[in-house]
Amino acid sequence: DAFAYAPKTPGLRNFMNEPDTWDTLERIRQMADSHGLTLLPEIHDPYAAGTYEKVARKGYMTYDLFLPGLVIDAIENHDGTRLMRWAEELREKNPRTVNMPGCHDGIPMLDLKGLLSDTEIEKLIALIVSRGGMIKNLHGAKNVYYQVNCTYFSALGADERKMLLARAIQL
C-alpha cells in the first residue's frame, strides 16, 4: 500500500522519488521472493501520468484503480464509451492489472483524471456522496479529491441489479 511514498529525500516531493522508489520496492520484492510471495503494489496516480505502465514495465502487477469509477460512470450514465476505451487500452498496453471494484479504500477518484474530465469526476463524487460516501482529499492538499469512502454496493445506490452488472463487467 502506498509504496510510492516510502523513500524520503530532503528537498524532493514525497511521491515517486526515482530511483529510490524502485530501489525500495526491489528490496521488498527480494524479501518476498525468498518466501514465495508475490508483491501487488498499490499506487494512486492520475491515469494520464502513466504510472501504472511504469509499474508494469518494472515487472509488477498492480491494482486497477480505474475500473471502480469507470463502471459506476458507465452504469449511471447508461454509456459505456469511456469504459470501453479504457478496456481497449488495457488490451493494447497489457499493464498487468488486478481488478477490484470494492476495497478498503472505497472508490478511487484521483486515478480517473485523464479518463474522465474534472466535471465528470466531480459529478461522480457528488453522486456517491449523495448515497452516503465520504470524500477523502489527498494528504496535504485541500479540495484535491483522492477517493470516496463507501462500499461499492452503496456507491451503486444499493441496487442489486447494478451490483450484479458491475461484477459481471469485472469478470
Predicted regions and their residues:
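Active-site and adjacent substrate-binding regions of carbohydrate-active enzymes
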Residues: 1-171
